[in-house]
């Protein structure tokens, strides 16, 4: 009673008379306001009455009080008696159950008190008979019960009996006659009804039988629908509604026998009655068979059977017998004619569809599984017919093709049928819904299929061209989505069930091609992955298609492509997704199937080709496939096969490329570059643009010509018939705006792949991915350049600064993309200017070309400034930078040889055609015409390129003076040129590699101011280790081509003096004195002569050998692979020297042995190079033939034979080399001798050249170094300790035969202490005495190994006594060596490099190597700090010279006097001339120098002062080559007279050299002091010349 307390609280009952009664009445009044029976207030009202009555039963309230209040409440509601009776009914049941007499008595009294409120009749309905008896309402409860049963039986179970004997047959006869009469007259249904009523009454007919007879007649006269429906409506007004439904149900039940067949007329009557709502579908549905659960079971059984068939078809059959069994089973299944059981629900559905009652038909289909009803052909055809009728007006308006008549479809006469569609909007009302219920079974009606497709095509045309309001656009968007759903759920599945209908496939493509490829591919994806599982029929079709595809693919070969292709085409018309999925899976496994499959696809429809493109993309995007092989170093074969197939199939057939291109772009956006392989293949096959690093030189030369020459001679295969396919590719790129995005993504991915893949992937794979990105970018860029028009290119490619700064494109890629745009733009401007003035002269044409170049390139010059920091433009001008990056090989040279070669090929071909007697005359004529036309095109193209190159060269000639600014040193200029121009571009492509080499040569030939060709070549060849190590495989190949072309030029100059004199003799690029003023005058004394150039070339060859050996000995995969590739590329021009070639051969042979089992690819490379190297061994020459070199004197010490750090001379011949290797003792002794001699040579040769090589600052630096010698003495002790560490000679490192010989040679250099002691210049008497003592001690140590040690000590003392005399002799020696025949010539013998590597302690060497590793320059030049250290060391040695064997003092003085007189005369003349030149230069440039800022002066001093040294510092990773001491000995002996080989005579000569060197030192010191005064007084005045002596390029003369 908790709920009762809520409605009627106990307090109300307690205070009933005071307030409770009023509260209760108020509550009931409120609850009675809502009269609804279903509202909550009604239930609360019932609850309140119940609680009040219950309180009376419990005795809390008197029944009089309750009856009074209930009487008052009865006024509130009319239904009060009924509610109160319900309450009494509940209380009656409860009190009976309680069996408490008091409560029962209270209940009886309450009811009796309320009898005036509730009638007896109501109480008799609700209360129990026993309660009624106790209340006195009935006499006996038992009698009451019996009477009630009788009445109910009579009402519900007794039927009125119409006895047929009593019913007269005449009545039924008259009824049938009445219904069967002619109804075309004036008879109406009302009149008919009155007659029927009369007959029923007259003959006492059963009304139900009369209704049944009316239905029978209606069934036989279907044409009078309206009449009978009106009659039945009128008749049913007199009957119960269920009667008609029961009679129909009885009729249907009659035909539900095992062999019964329900007549269609009955279905039609039922359908019409349903349509006119005379019966309810739910009432009739229960009378029909089969039951819904039986239908569901049947559907499931069909799916299970379909899956069973799939399992059978996909089962692996091992024997031929089983195959035969399977074929027999298939035949039996086909023979079975399935007789469907009588399904009354489907029959009624068909009738509903035929009369156009779509709503009731839809309700029936909703009760069944999806597509169950439509899977029955009659139902499907009925739906199709209804759709035909509904879309007829719209199809007649928009779908009928021009010229076609068509067969009109008559509309239904039924007004209740769906309305016909007049517009696309009307299709939404019913038609799309009908298609959804029809599903894949539209296949039964191909005509309707075509109609729907044509309507869809018309809608898409209207949709794409419509510019209506926003509301209309929203409506059309909805219709578009409906068409897409129809295509997904109806059209494509129906096509799968059609029997190879190619026409329907083409018709469907007419609509599909108007969809964007995104919509199409979504539809194909649903078709392939979802649709075939939605219906048992489609499951079977899928299995059968796969089975057939397997059969065809097993038999597909190159020989039977045509018949197999026809079978594939036939199978693809209906089920392309399943077929192509299987074919692609086979291609991924067996790449030899690619060619026959591509050839067999020529019988496909357009839709099938589009589906093929989708299937390819889906196969590529398969997440379950690994894109790398198990070794993680190579791309998987399945991906390579698919890529190859893509290229072939997209080239041969007109397939839409947009989806594939977008897929590649999306993969790049996601940072995945594997799929670039696809793009590479597609571009190669479709456009004929081939990217390979294995191009021959003939092909490479052809690639520098015009487009025709490229096509004929630039590729491995003949490029034929690519015009259409390349046009298709171009259109796809432009239509979807993918041209530039793909380029930018590739360029960004190229740089990003290193960081994205670097940590996880193998270095070899990362390199391949980088190369793939780069190669595809180059290939794609070439395609765009050759196929896009000027307007398209300019419209799509932004300016260079936008590309680099906004899109973050690397500079090399940005210029690569922009270069064709500049060329197109210049060409179009030039053509415009030519047209404006026709018939102008050649000079005017050149002028116009230059004008057009300026117009196009001026904005580019401004744009490139933002690409680098402002400091860069102090070294090179933006114009030079832009010119370098904008030109190509096509602009620089004409490949006459290639043109001639291709023309000759055509001539031979024409001759072969003439000689061919079997060829038909017509074909012969056509072929000859083709060859002649091609020949004319080539000749015309050659002429056009010749004119173009002439114009370009004229332009460059005018521009060259502004290219390189004189604001910075030539060393820095070359650094920036190499760093920003040469190195980035030479590894971009093979043609760019050739271009870079030719451009350097061109800049040299143009006599470009401020450009040092010598320095440029030296920086390129000096140290290639880091460049090679940082390259990928393809970049190494390109870098090798670049070095090959550079070596070709150098070798041409080296091989012939006349060529050298002609091309280099008077060129500013070969000046050895570098001037900061920009004046590169042709002073012959400043030029490098031919012999010294040959020394320099030998040095370069030695440097290449040293770098190669270093890379080969590292053991690193990348180092070894890349250096082998580079060496293979430069093989035509290197090695030329026999001992260098032998050194390389030994190292490569070692690689072959070591890598044979470990790394097969390195082994293959090494073996290939080794074989080629051996084949060129006959072309190698000894070193003395390569550059001029005197044979060594018989008794010469090692110091004469070897340069500092050079190899022992015994290695120059085979026998001496063998003796060195066989005898360890002899090797050690010769090394000690050579090192003791080397220290003296080093001191002498490091004096003046070090000062000269410092480019202007050397004088002051040397002077300061001499003054600071006292400070250095403390450091010398530490240095002596370091010098004790083992140092390896260069020959031991570079040219050692094997690893076992190295430890023998890597011993401490004992004479380092002696050298360090001698390098200290004595300043006082005490110091001299100390110096002498140290010299004695150290000389005694080496007495056993050096025969002339005592003579050294005496000579040292002699030098200390006469320092001024030695300086005079040095000066004389300088004048002797520099004056030949009246003109100044630089002599390498007097110039010396810094300390060799073998003399540098190990820690110091590591420091230098680390500095070089971190140096920003591409050529790895040294830092200023290192250079200054070496300058100090060399300056400290300024007054220390050779220590030859002693001579008698008298002889020495006599010879000294003679030499001194001669040298003084020459030195006076030289001083006068130098002073005069210096004054002139000072007067010419004093104004300019005053304007130079002090910080710039300082920077120039520092940078130029180290220029000469920097080259040696760059050699630190390996042993630096230094001047040949034999050549020096030769030069020195010429200046001091002839000698015949004795030790004393040799000592006399060396003494002269040392004294001559000191004289030169004093002469240089005077110049330095003058310059220091000038610097300290002026402050702003800059030095005018920077001596760039040959020590920078001096070579090792070490024997190999």
UniProtKB/Swiss-Prot annotation:
Residue stretches of biased makeup (Polar residues): 1416-1425
Source organism, top-level taxon: Eukaryota
Transmembrane segments: none
Database matches in InterPro entries: Tho2, THO_THOC2_C, THO_THOC2_N, THOC2_N
Chain residue ranges for the region called Bow domain: 164-534
Residues covered by region (Anchor domain): 1-163
Motif Nuclear localization signal boundaries: 923-928
Biased composition (Basic and acidic residues): 1218-1234, 1265-1285, 1294-1343, 1353-1383, 1449-1504, 1524-1585
Coiled-coil zones: 293-339, 896-965, 1464-1491
UniProt entry tagged with the keyword ATP-binding: no
GO biological process: generation of neurons; mRNA export from nucleus; mRNA processing; neuron development; RNA splicing
GO CC, one annotated term: nucleus
Keywords recorded for this protein, A-Z: Coiled coil, Cytoplasm, mRNA processing, mRNA splicing, mRNA transport, Nucleus, Phosphoprotein, RNA-binding, Transport
A Pfam family: Tho2
GO MF term list: mRNA binding
Assembly notes: Component of the THO subcomplex, which is composed of THOC1, THOC2, THOC3, THOC5, THOC6 and THOC7. The THO subcomplex interacts with DDX39B to form the THO-DDX39B complex which multimerizes into a 28-subunit tetrameric assembly. Component of the transcription/export (TREX) complex at least composed of ALYREF/THOC4, DDX39B, SARNP/CIP29, CHTOP and the THO subcomplex; in the complex interacts with THOC1, THOC3, THOC5, THOC7 and DDX39B. TREX seems to have a dynamic structure involving ATP-dependent remodeling. Interacts with POLDIP3 and ZC3H11A.
UniProt family annotation: Belongs to the THOC2 family.
Record-given protein name: THO complex subunit 2
Organism: Callithrix jacchus
Taxon lineage: Eukaryota, Metazoa, Chordata, Craniata, Vertebrata
